[in-house]
């Protein structure tokens, strides 16, 4: 018979499962402690407290180890845990959060008593005295000194962590993050004082030590230290003394052994500089050599130990330089470099888990705050504070950022720092890496350690994931808003609630710091955008902070802002435009990069704005790549064919060409196309326009019987024939005709010439679009020869009169438009000239070499730099192409694969046939690609054809970015260009025999 117990008689003790203990031996461990036998309220409360530990199993394992240590006094501890709720909260939270502090307690089992009763942390001065007393008490026992100091430091961290964590287990006061960080800095100060005392005694003995000041930097200097962090220091000496460096080195050694790593890398000249300098030496360095980041680092400087008077003199001398740093000539360049360096530090595979360096992470907050301090503290002393939280408050009070934004940024910053603290406490290791999102156990532990509770929809881990996402997004948004929203408020309509601290002068300073060379002009553009009437102005006010931030990373933010204003005014009636930028951040970010890099593409976008909608990604990738050049060509030709009037037909063709050029240029600038793909696409659209113009002109010029007197073919020459057109390339062509049946040559040529002339005139009509110039000067007899010849006339000319340069030009001949069959017959005819069965004559080769030498000395434009002229300069396009063509002239009769109009494909054949060593061919290939990228980039940046790379400066930086260089360092890009072309020139000389 089964007897059911009354509810009041059932055991009160919760089961292992209800306690959340998942280790299989958990039940045995509870039994070992005797916690499973008593059903009184004290034991029930004890077990529920244990269950609330961030990792209850880890806490239980540590308790077992403590109970097994005879020095713990387990009976006393057990009894205290049953009676003292505050002790349970402190001990269980520490053991469930920190494996390292659990190990410390097991190694020092009496330290649990530090967590009993009313725990009061010692003051800054009390800490210093206690650590120095520990040193004094250990005199004569050097072997135990480091151990005793380490134990004392860990005991303090144990107490602080227990107070910090207790609220996760029991209803204990929550210790504010700022208090925890400041208390950790106090401990670091005391530790450094003890280490300095040891070092002075070790190095100086009974003699007076040298006067040294130790300046804390970074988070220690700002009193916002982590549980585990390197402590950055700078040493200042009163005078030169050989003992200075010995004392400093010994201090760092002792501190690193007992407490934490001490790093002096922020000193002048970094690790290569002297460890200790006099104050005068520091002043001289910062006056002459220091970089912007070094002044930024000084924002956190604080004398901590050593000679206090010397430390204050150090601050008095250097801090005025910090507040003037934004006036330095290279301030903007260095700030931009620092911003990019922060982004590049994080490996892509962990970027989403990085608390410090990831997007929306701690460094975003710290960098933004420090930059605003550097810009505005020059004229506002209230901003001259060290800690990030204090600086945010001061910026809000001063009106440099909105008060609500300051409060939100502070809350996000403190939340992220709290997570950082919890991650570091676990093993007392320096880390900023969140657990893998798939590691459910680790995420749950972090959530509980951070006192995050389930919310009814998600468990603690789910709440943490949502909160992290929210905070990262908020930081990212506020990061841009901090920089730009007050600027807009200072110039916007009254409804924007003007930030009272942001004068136009201050706004200009901030824009200058963010990379704008003409800040007052930029403010005018911004004012014009946000002060538009109605909805447009309001939307711009919302959009601009983020758009301006993205644009500030572009090489030319001033030009980009002007282009954005012009584009916005041109599209004022297009409702989709601002909606797209508002709702699709990826589109907006890409557009800002394009506008801030190129003068060529923005002009096209104003007349082909729908291309902007292709800046987003589709299911298969970037929509800019969904368009096939061949499909565009077919559509262009078909569109033109619908108009009987040639001018309207070409206007339609220009519209499609404009759209395609905008697409190609955009994709190129965004790094979505290889340079060879760009050249092929540009060639394709040029050929399509040419075909459309030829078709429409033939239709409009037919005689009454609608029978064309001749067939016409257009032969592409030069880069058009090689499908290697750039943005600024001419289209070199020749026209060939063949009389229709019953039509004599003279009439056929006359009619065909009229067609060719009208096509050239129609395409060459001045336009706001990039020009469509046809150059027919490579035809027989050049400008003096007839524009159109029959096939027979060409054959007769080349057979009898062909000059070496004309033979060379024919190497690039390719039928591109008009009658395809006639075009192919032309190519077969010229094959006899360009690829003769026995090769070209030695005289022809000599003539080619002579012409090449003359071009090098005569054709380079006056004032051009031969080292950086992408077309005619050393190792430039002409060098590579002439080298390839010389080898074709010499060997094409033996190597049929050299019957090829493409430079790159011909280089492949040259290497495969071993006509030139493969390594040399690779040098030629890289030079051609490098020069082509640079030449294309020049047009994209300047908006007009040019071949000369600019000197150092913003324009060269823009060319570097447009050419796909890995950063915007124009000097680095130029060095690479010079190196690649110099090596290629050596190969050119070998091939040409000079």
Curated annotation (Swiss-Prot):
Keyword Ion transport: no
Keywords associated with the record: ATP-binding, Magnesium, Multifunctional enzyme, Nucleotide-binding, Nucleotidyltransferase, Transferase
Cellular component per GO, a single term: peptidoglycan-based cell wall
Keyword GTP-binding: no
Location of the region described as Adenylyl removase in the Swiss-Prot/TrEMBL record: 1-487
Reactions listed under catalytic activity: [glutamine synthetase]-O(4)-(5'-adenylyl)-L-tyrosine + phosphate = [glutamine synthetase]-L-tyrosine + ADP; [glutamine synthetase]-L-tyrosine + ATP = [glutamine synthetase]-O(4)-(5'-adenylyl)-L-tyrosine + diphosphate
EC number in record: 2.7.7.89, 2.7.7.42
Pfam families attached to this UniProt entry: GlnD_UR_UTase, GlnE
Cofactor annotation: Mg(2+)
Gene Ontology biological process: regulation of glutamine family amino acid metabolic process; regulation of L-glutamine biosynthetic process
Highest taxon of the lineage: Bacteria
UniProt region (Adenylyl transferase), positions on chain: 492-994
GO molecular function: [glutamate-ammonia-ligase] adenylyltransferase activity; [glutamine synthetase]-adenylyl-L-tyrosine phosphorylase activity; ATP binding; magnesium ion binding
Stretch forming the signal peptide: none
Function comment: Involved in the regulation of glutamine synthetase GlnA, a key enzyme in the process to assimilate ammonia. When cellular nitrogen levels are high, the C-terminal adenylyl transferase (AT) inactivates GlnA by covalent transfer of an adenylyl group from ATP to specific tyrosine residue of GlnA, thus reducing its activity. Conversely, when nitrogen levels are low, the N-terminal adenylyl removase (AR) activates GlnA by removing the adenylyl group by phosphorolysis, increasing its activity.
Additional notes on this entry: Was identified as a high-confidence drug target.
Similarity annotation: Belongs to the GlnE family.
Descriptive protein name: Bifunctional glutamine synthetase adenylyltransferase/adenylyl-removing enzyme
The organism of origin for this protein: Mycobacterium tuberculosis (strain ATCC 25618 / H37Rv)
């Amino acid at each position: 018979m089964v007897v059911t117990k009354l509810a009041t008689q059932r055991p009160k003790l919760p089961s292992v499962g209800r306690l959340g203990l998942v280790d299989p031996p958990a039940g045995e461990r509870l039994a070992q402690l005797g916690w499973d036998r008593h059903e009184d309220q004290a034991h029930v409360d004890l077990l529920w407290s244990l269950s609330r530990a961030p990792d209850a199993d880890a806490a239980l394992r540590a308790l077992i180890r403590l109970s097994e240590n005879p020095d713990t006094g387990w009976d006393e501890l057990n009894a205290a845990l049953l009676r003292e709720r505050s002790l349970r909260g402190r001990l269980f939270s520490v053991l469930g959060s920190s494996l390292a502090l659990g190990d410390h307690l097991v190694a020092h089992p009496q330290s649990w008593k530090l967590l009993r009763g009313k725990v009061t942390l010692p003051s800054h001065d009390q800490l210093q005295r206690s650590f120095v007393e520990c040193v004094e008490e250990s005199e004569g026992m050097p072997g135990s000194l480091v151990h005793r100091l380490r134990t004392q430091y860990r005991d303090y961290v144990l107490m602080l962590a227990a107070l910090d964590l207790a609220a996760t287990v029991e209803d204990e006061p929550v210790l504010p993050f700022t208090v925890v960080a400041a208390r950790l800095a106090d401990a670091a100060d005391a530790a450094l004082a003890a280490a300095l005392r040891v070092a002075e005694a070790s190095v100086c003995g009974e003699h007076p030590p040298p006067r040294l000041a130790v300046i804390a930097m970074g988070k220690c200097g700002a009193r916002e230290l982590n549980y585990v962090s390197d402590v950055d220091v700078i040493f200042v000496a009163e005078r030169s003394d050989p003992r200075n460096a010995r004392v400093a080195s010994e201090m760092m050694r002792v501190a690193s052994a007992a407490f934490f790593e001490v790093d002096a890398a922020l000193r002048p000249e970094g690790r290569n500089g002297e460890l200790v300098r006099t104050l005068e030496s520091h002043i001289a360095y910062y006056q002459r050599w220091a970089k912007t980041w070094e002044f930024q680092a000084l924002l956190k400087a604080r004398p901590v130990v050593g000679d206090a008077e010397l430390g204050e003199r150090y601050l008095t001398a250097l801090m005025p330089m910090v507040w003037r740093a934004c006036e330095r000539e290279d301030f903007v360049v260095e700030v931009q470099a620092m911003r990019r360096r922060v982004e590049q530090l994080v490996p892509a595979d962990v970027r989403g888990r990085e608390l410090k360096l990831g997007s929306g992470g701690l460094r975003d907050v710290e960098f933004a705050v420090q930059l605003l301090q550097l810009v505005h503290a020059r004229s506002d002393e209230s901003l001259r504070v060290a800690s990030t939280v204090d600086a945010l408050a001061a910026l809000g009070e001063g009106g440099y950022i909105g008060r609500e934004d300051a409060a939100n940024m502070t809350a996000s910053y403190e939340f992220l720092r709290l997570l950082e603290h919890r991650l570091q406490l676990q093993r007392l290791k320096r880390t900023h890496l969140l657990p893998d999102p798939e590691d459910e156990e680790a995420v749950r532990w972090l959530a509980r350690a951070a006192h995050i509770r389930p919310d009814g929809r998600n468990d603690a881990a789910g709440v943490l994931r949502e909160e992290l996402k929210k905070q990262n997004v908020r930081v990212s948004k506020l990061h841009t808003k901090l920089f730009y929203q007050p600027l807009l408020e200072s110039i916007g309509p009254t409804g924007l609630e003007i930030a009272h601290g942001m004068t136009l002068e201050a706004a200009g300073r901030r824009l200058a710091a963010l990379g704008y060379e003409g800040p007052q002009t930029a403010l005018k553009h911004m004012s014009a955008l946000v002060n538009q009437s109605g909805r447009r102005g309001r939307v711009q006010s919302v959009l601009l902070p983020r758009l301006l931030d993205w644009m500030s990373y572009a090489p030319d933010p001033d030009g980009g802002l002007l282009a954005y204003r012009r584009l916005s005014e041109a599209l004022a009636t297009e409702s989709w435009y601002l909606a797209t930028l508002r709702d699709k951040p990826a589109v907006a970010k890409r557009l800002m990069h394009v506008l801030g890099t190129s003068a060529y593409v923005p002009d096209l976008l104003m007349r082909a704005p729908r291309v902007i909608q292709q800046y987003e990604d589709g299911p298969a990738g970037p929509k800019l790549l969904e368009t096939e050049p061949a499909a565009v060509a077919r559509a262009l030709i078909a569109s033109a064919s619908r108009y009987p009037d040639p001018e309207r037909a070409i206007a339609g063709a220009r519209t499609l060409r404009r759209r395609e050029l905008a697409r190609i240029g955009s994709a190129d600038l965004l790094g979505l196309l290889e340079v060879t793909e760009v050249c092929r696409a540009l060639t394709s659209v040029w050929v399509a326009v040419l075909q459309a113009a030829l078709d429409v002109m033939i239709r409009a010029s037919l005689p009454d019987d609608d029978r064309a007197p001749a067939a016409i073919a257009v032969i592409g020459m030069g880069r058009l024939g090689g499908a290697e057109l750039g943005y600024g390339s001419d289209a070199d062509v020749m026209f060939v005709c063949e009389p229709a049946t019953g039509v004599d040559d003279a009439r056929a040529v006359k009619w065909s010439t009229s067609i060719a002339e009208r096509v050239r005139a129609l395409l060459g009509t001045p336009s706001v679009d990039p020009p469509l110039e046809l150059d027919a000067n490579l035809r027989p007899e050049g400008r003096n020869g007839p524009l159109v010849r029959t096939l027979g006339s060409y054959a007769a000319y080349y057979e009898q009169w062909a000059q070496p340069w004309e033979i060379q030009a024919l190497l690039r001949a390719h039928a591109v438009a008009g009658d395809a069959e006639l075009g192919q017959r032309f190519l077969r005819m010229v094959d006899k000239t360009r690829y003769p069965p026995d090769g070209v004559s030695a005289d022809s080769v000599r003539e080619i070499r002579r012409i090449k030498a003359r071009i090098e000395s005569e054709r380079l434009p006056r004032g051009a730099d031969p080292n950086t002229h992408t077309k005619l300069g050393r190792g430039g396009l002409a060098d590579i192409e002439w080298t390839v063509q010389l080898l074709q002239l010499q060997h094409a009769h033996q190597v049929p694969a050299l019957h090829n109009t493409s430079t790159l494909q011909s280089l492949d054949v040259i290497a495969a046939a071993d006509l030139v060593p493969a390594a040399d061919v690779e040098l030629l290939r890289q030079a051609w690609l490098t020069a082509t990228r640079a030449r294309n980039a020049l047009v994209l940046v300047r908006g007009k054809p040019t071949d000369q790379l600019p000197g150092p400066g913003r324009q060269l930086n823009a060319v570097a970015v447009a050419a796909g260089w890995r950063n915007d360092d124009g000097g680095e890009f130029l060095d690479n260009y010079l190196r690649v072309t110099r090596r290629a020139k050596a190969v050119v000389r070998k091939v040409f025999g000079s």
